[in-house]
């Protein structure tokens, strides 16, 4: 890991602190709010502009080295909104745990951050149809000397594990019997990588997509990613699927978005869009994975 690599990523974190990055065009600061009344979809069509929120988590939604927003979710959102006649997508960077509160406060209109669909989140906002599904994995030292391959191994061997703030993995870990004092909550993927590399924790839990991307972008660091798996809760595998998030009152926007998202999924265009970010055909949600089921789980 070179000092220059860390410096570039520190730029991403500083961008997040200021709250706005570009999606092909200059963006408004996150302090600026969206239309306070009326139909959000019609307002977006009239202005040809929609505002999205991201959390700067690669490869789901992040700023590249030039400050342009990209990633799986922003690129899918861009394709959907283009089909709806909305040409410009403006992005605000918000800490992950503040995305839904900022959405509710109308700082932007859609969360495009690959957010996992959970029962708790569904009480606060409305999710699109599942955009993708992903397995969970662990970032471990090269060679995985402790042979930690699943969350239950973390519990059994009492190793320390890192998770991202407000991410679902902490719940998966505690559900697998991992004690709170084994879990270290961190604010960025880079800090997760550092913690494993430096030996402050043995492993880090996140989606296999995120961890593979992290390793790919940091060659030379002595870490590896375990095979992906579904976490187990109450003896049953937990399906992890993410989607886009809307305010509960924005049904017309959500419904129109879902219709175009389905077209992308069905046509194969979605796979083309997301392949550069480590996603593929296997990440298309199965037909029985629905928002209704995920919100009730």
Give residue ranges: language-model regions.
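Extended ligand-binding regions for polar small-molecule ligands
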Residues: 33, 74-83, 144, 152, ...
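Extracytoplasmic small-molecule ligand-binding "clamshell" domains
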Residues: 20, 39-113
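Ligand-binding clefts/hinges and TM-proximal coupling segments of bilobed small-molecule sensing domains
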Residues: 168-183, 223, 256-297
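Bilobed "Venus flytrap"/periplasmic-binding protein-like clamshell domains
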Residues: 51-52, 56-59, 69-84, 135-193, ...
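A ligand-binding cleft/hinge motif common to bilobed small-molecule-binding domains
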Residues: 115-123, 172-175, 202-238
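Acidic, polar ligand-binding/catalytic clefts
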Residues: 78, 89-153
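Periplasmic-binding protein-like
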Residues: 133-137, 219-258, 281-297
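N-terminal secretory signal peptides
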Residues: 1-10, 17-30
């Amino acid at each position: 890991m070179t000092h220059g690599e860390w410096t570039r990523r520190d730029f991403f974190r500083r961008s997040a602190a200021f709250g706005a990055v570009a999606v092909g065009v200059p963006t408004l600061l996150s302090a600026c709010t969206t239309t306070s009344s009326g139909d959000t979809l019609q307002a977006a069509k009239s202005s040809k502009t929609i505002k999205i929120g991201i959390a700067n988590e690669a490869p789901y939604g992040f700023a590249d080295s030039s400050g342009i927003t990209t990633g799986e979710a922003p690129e899918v959102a861009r394709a959907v909104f283009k089909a709806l006649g909305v040409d410009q997508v403006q992005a605000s960077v918000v800490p992950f745990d503040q995305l839904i509160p900022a959405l509710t406060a109308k700082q932007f209109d859609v969360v495009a951050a690959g957010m996992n669909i959970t029962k708790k989140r569904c009480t606060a906002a409305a999710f699109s149809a599942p955009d993708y599904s992903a397995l969970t994995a662990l970032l471990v030292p090269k060679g995985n000397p402790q042979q930690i391959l699943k969350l239950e191994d973390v519990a059994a061997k009492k190793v320390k594990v890192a998770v991202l703030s407000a991410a679902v993995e902490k719940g998966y870990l505690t559900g697998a019997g991992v004690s709170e004092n084994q879990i270290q909550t961190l604010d960025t993927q880079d800090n997760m990588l550092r913690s494993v590399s430096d030996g402050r924790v043995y492993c880090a839990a996140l989606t296999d997509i995120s961890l593979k991307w992290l390793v790919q972008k940091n060659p030379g660091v002595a870490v590896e990613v375990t095979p992906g798996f579904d976490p187990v809760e109450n003896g049953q595998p937990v399906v992890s699927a993410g989607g886009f998030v809307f305010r509960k009152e924005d049904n017309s926007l959500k419904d129109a978005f879902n219709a175009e998202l389905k077209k992308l999924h069905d046509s194969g265009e979605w796979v083309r869009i997301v392949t550069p970010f480590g996603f593929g055909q296997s990440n298309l949600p199965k037909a029985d994975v629905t928002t209704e089921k995920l919100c009730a789980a």
